[in-house]
UniProtKB/Swiss-Prot annotation:
One of its GO terms (cellular component) is nucleus. It is found in: Nucleus. Keywords: Activator, Developmental protein, DNA-binding, Nucleus, Transcription, Transcription regulation. The keyword Ligase does not apply. Residues 56-110 form the TCP domain. This is Transcription factor PCF1. Residues 167-183 have a biased composition (Low complexity). Expressed in seedlings and leaves, mostly in the lower region rich in dividing cells. Transcription activator. Binds the promoter core sequence 5'-GGNCC-3', especially at sites IIa (5'-GGGCCCAC-3') and IIb (5'-GGTCCCAC-3') (essential for meristematic tissue-specificity expression) of the PCNA gene promoter. Can target the TCP motif 5'-TGGGCC/T-3'. Residues 18-68, 157-183 are annotated as: Disordered. Forms homodimers and heterodimers with PCF2. Interacts with SPL14/IPA1. GO terms for molecular function: DNA-binding transcription factor activity; sequence-specific DNA binding. The gene is PCF1.
């Protein structure tokens, strides 16, 4: 039995000759009927599935990354997918966040910046020249580094009203978001 949502098309028009004026056309039956079993005259049913229209909106959250996407080599992506399965995470994003937490001591050693969750304000923390200057004032490279275990969580928070928009940072460097997308 066919479902009521199935659409069946029948080829009701016989094959057209190359010269239609040579053969008289006796009013063919072009009526559309409800879904019925194919007739014995050779018409074959064809099922057509309705196509889903592609969504134009991006389903992912935006962060302060100027609309950029992260492109990674295929081998790195394969390893992330494998780790996701091995660690039992539900998404690849969880795996990448886990990897960042594991690598945070090395990141702090390389960059000299970070914020502990106790010191972090409820809004997003700007990691920039002020953090580097504070780390340098605390004792240079040998000073106490501040830890950022939840850096991605800080990025996901909405910006404060008193923070400058990201466009000003792009214009200060001489590039625009359109230039970044073209690279």
């Amino acid at each position: 039995m066919m479902a009521s949502s199935d659409l069946i098309l029948y080829n009701l028009v016989p094959a057209q000759p190359l010269n239609p004026s040579a053969i008289p056309n006796p009013n063919p039956d072009l009526s559309i009927a409800a879904a019925e079993p194919p007739s014995s005259d050779g018409a074959t049913p064809r099922r057509v599935r309705p196509r889903k229209s592609p969504s134009s909106s991006d389903r992912h959250s935006k962060v302060a990354g100027r609309g950029r996407r992260v492109r990674i080599p295929a081998m790195v992506a394969a390893r992330v997918f494998q780790l996701t399965r091995e660690l039992g995470h539900r998404t690849d994003g969880e795996t990448i966040e886990w990897l960042l937490r594991q690598a945070e001591p090395s990141i702090i050693a390389a960059t000299g910046t970070g914020v502990t969750p106790e010191e972090a304000p409820p809004a997003a923390v700007a990691i920039g020249s002020s953090s580097v200057a504070a780390a340098a004032a605390a004792g240079g490279h040998g000073g106490a580094f501040v830890h950022v275990p939840y850096y991605t969580a800080l990025l996901m928070q909405p910006p404060n009203a008193d923070e400058p928009p990201m466009a000003s940072a792009a214009s200060a460097s001489g590039t625009t978001a359109a230039d970044e997308n073209n690279n």
